[in-house]
Structure formats: C-alpha cells, structure tokens
C-alpha cells in the first residue's frame, strides 16, 4: 500500500511539473526612455540588442547585474539613443561577440565603443543580411538591411529575427519604410509573434505592407514618456490597431517582458489600451528646440576638419564629432568641395 502511495505521489509530482510552463525564453524590452534596448534570454544564454542612450547606461548595466556573461551584443545602428549605453556594458561585463553595422560611425561615441570592445576582448564582426547564429536554444537570423545605399542611416539598421521553438521575435532598430519594403520583397519568412516596433513607433515605419508580412500578435513600443518626437505616432498606432495587434508601451508601462516556453507567449503586463500618442511637450523643452533652430539658421553646413566631410546642421553625425573637429560654416557646397571637403553619405548635403 505504501509503495502504491509513493508511486502516486511521484506520478502527481511529475504531472504537476509538466503542467507548469518553463521560463526557458524571455524577451526584455527595457525602459530606457527615448531609446531602445532589448535583452534576449534563452536557456541561460544572453544577447543584448542595443543599449539605449547615455542617460540609460547605468540603468542597463544595473539591469544586467547577475548575468555572468553576454554571448552577444548587437548594435543595430549608430544613433546615440541605441548604442551609447552599450559602452558601459562593455566596460563591466564579459562578452563573446559584438555585432556592428557594415558601415563606420563617427565621433567620440563611436571611438568609445571601439575602445570598449578592444578592452573587453570580444570578437567584433559586421552584421550582414543572411547571417545566422544561435544564442542558447534560440536561432537568430539577420534579415536586414538588404542593401547599404540608403540615404537614411535608419534604414541601414541591422534587423534581427529571433526564433525559439514555434515562436519568433522581430527587432529592427530604426528601420523605416524603404528598408521595410525591401525586406518584404527579399526575405522569405518574416512572420513574428512579437514585433518590437521600428523607430519607436514613428509614422515613417510599420507600414501596412510590412505588418502584413510580419503579421504580429503582439507589438512592443519603446519610447520616452512625453518625448519631443510625438512617438508613437497616431498613424502607426492606427495601423497596429487595424491589424488587431496587442500593444505594450515602455512609456506607459515601463520595462516589458515577454515569456515563452517555445509554444505559448505571455507577458508580465496586460496589453495597453492607450491608442493615442503623447502631445509635443511645451515650456522649457519647446524653448530649447526653438533656440536650437535659431542657432542652426546662422550657418549652412557643419564640417568635420578631421574626416574632411561636411554635413547639414541637423545631421546625427554632428553631435558625435569632437569639439575640436567641428567647424560651423556658411560657405556654399561648391566652395566646400573646392576646399577638399566631401559630402556626408548619410545626410547628403
């Protein structure tokens, strides 16, 4: 009788054990404000895709505390709000592999990234469409960009499709309409259960054709509360709603975690019912923007005296230049070319 009772207890234990979902995979979309950072955890292995901006660096480093090593860190593109936070991670945590875009960045921030990677000792590779690798039991494929001659640096963002069991997750940095359409034309399989919304929910991304191909059940928007860009845009929110997607928002809900056992996906938050964007901030922020506009009207181009390239004042590369290399000028394009300067390949002045 005792033996039968023991057998029943053992059977019950394993039955209950089998009925509890295994937290084998997690996708963390970190609350880094107006930026993006995604942590993939698969069977005790880790991949960090982007690290948010400078202001988020200490938060990201703290969030990763307890992880002994990162299998991989990836930079989708060289926007400050996506890769500045990675520098602190490289300084504090061992990493096997650093994946960077197939074009070079500029300025102090880029040099700090290169120095951090060198100090860390990780292997550095340039990500390209079609590249595949594993993180634990997760399969990771780079599906974009499909070309590198885009005028916008956003469209050059590395795009990662992560598969675990029957579930898939899509993270594409700041990819916009042109890159999205090229992926739809070129990539065989784009379906993803969870879509980390491109470019923080900008109206220039998440077009209907792209959403048709991805066909997500869940979408996570990473953006800062009350950000100056109006992210997420009403147009993008409407498109997501029209596709019947459940949305999660870091600006409203903080860090979002999607759990999976390879079959089912569940979140640590209920889906957001906030289908409106945040209004443009006023007051001090508006005054700051107006002052910047006045300053940029005083000159035509900004030159990098080190690289001998000239840029539009609002080019992202301008903020990354060293102060001693930054030259403001009202010279014409022809005059700058005559002096040996070349136009920036990103802003195409």
What is the meaning of each model-derived region?
Residues 8-19:
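Bacterial N-terminal signal peptides
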Residues 277-349:
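Mature, structured domains enriched in cysteine- and short glycine motifs
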Residues 6-8, 56, 303-304, 334:
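Short linear sequence motifs
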Residues 2-3, 18-297, 345:
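Non-globular, low-confidence helical/coil segments that flank catalytic cores
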């Amino acid at each position: 009788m005792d033996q039968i009772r023991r057998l029943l207890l053992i059977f019950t234990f394993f039955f209950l054990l089998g009925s509890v979902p295994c937290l084998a995979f997690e996708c963390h979309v970190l609350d880094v404000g107006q930026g993006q950072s995604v942590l993939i955890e698969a069977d005790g292995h880790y991949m960090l895709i982007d690290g948010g901006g400078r202001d988020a660096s200490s938060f990201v480093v703290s969030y990763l505390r307890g992880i002994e090593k990162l299998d991989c860190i990836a930079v989708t593109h060289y926007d400050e709000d996506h890769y500045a936070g990675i520098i602190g991670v490289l300084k504090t945590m061992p990493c096997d592999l650093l994946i960077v875009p197939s074009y070079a960045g500029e300025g102090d921030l880029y040099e700090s990234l290169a120095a951090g990677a060198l100090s860390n000792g990780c292997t550095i590779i340039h990500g390209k469409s079609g590249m595949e690798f594993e993180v634990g039991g997760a399969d990771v494929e780079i599906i974009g960009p499909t070309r590198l001659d885009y005028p916008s640096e956003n469209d050059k963002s590395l795009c990662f499709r992560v598969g675990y069991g029957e579930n898939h997750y899509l993270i594409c940095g700041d990819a916009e309409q042109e890159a999205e359409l090229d992926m739809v034309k070129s990539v065989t399989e784009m379906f993803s259960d969870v879509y980390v919304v491109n470019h923080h929910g900008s109206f220039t991304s998440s077009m209907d054709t792209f959403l048709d191909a991805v066909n997500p059940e869940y979408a996570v928007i990473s953006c800062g509360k009350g950000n100056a860009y109006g992210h997420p845009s009403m147009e993008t929110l409407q498109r997501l709603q029209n596709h019947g997607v459940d949305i999660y928002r870091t600006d409203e809900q903080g860090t979002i975690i999607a759990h999976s056992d390879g079959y089912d996906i569940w979140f640590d938050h209920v889906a957001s019912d906030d289908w409106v964007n945040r209004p443009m901030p006023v007051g001090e922020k508006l005054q700051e923007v107006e002052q910047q506009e006045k300053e940029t009207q005083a000159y035509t181009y900004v030159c990098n005296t080190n690289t001998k390239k000239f840029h539009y004042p609002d080019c992202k590369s301008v903020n990354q230049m060293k102060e001693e290399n930054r030259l403001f000028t009202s010279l014409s394009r022809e005059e700058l070319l005559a002096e040996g300067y070349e136009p920036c390949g990103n802003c195409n002045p």
